[in-house]
Amino acid sequence: MMRTSPRDSISNLPDEILGKILSLLPTKVAASTSVLSKRWRNLLGLVDNLCFDESVVVYPNKEEAFKWFTSIL
């Protein structure tokens, strides 16, 4: 007989703790966690340390890049 496994430990953590954990990851990796579940979609808003690599953002000028950056905050 197959037993159901208990919920993983990380799912039991409060959102604030998960936000702190995401703060320790590179921003690109932290952002990619938003596809894990509905709960994870909003956790990036709890990250208190975002570090963007502007070399991967393709915009014609700094003004457009700044508009994009502020739109996601």
Curated annotation (Swiss-Prot):
Residue ranges of coiled coil: none
Look up the domain of life of the source: Eukaryota
The name this protein goes by in its record? Putative F-box protein At1g47915
PANTHER family in alphabetical order: RNI-LIKE SUPERFAMILY PROTEIN (PTHR31293:SF12)
What SUPFAM superfamilies does UniProt report for this protein, alphabetically?
A: F-box domain
Cross-referenced CDD domains: F-box_AtFBL13-like
What the entry lists under Pfam families is as follows: F-box (PF00646)
Instruction: Please name the InterPro entries in this protein's record.
Output: F-box-like_dom_sf, F-box_AtFBL13-like, F-box_dom, FBL60-like
Report the residue ranges that make up the F-box domain in this protein.
7-55
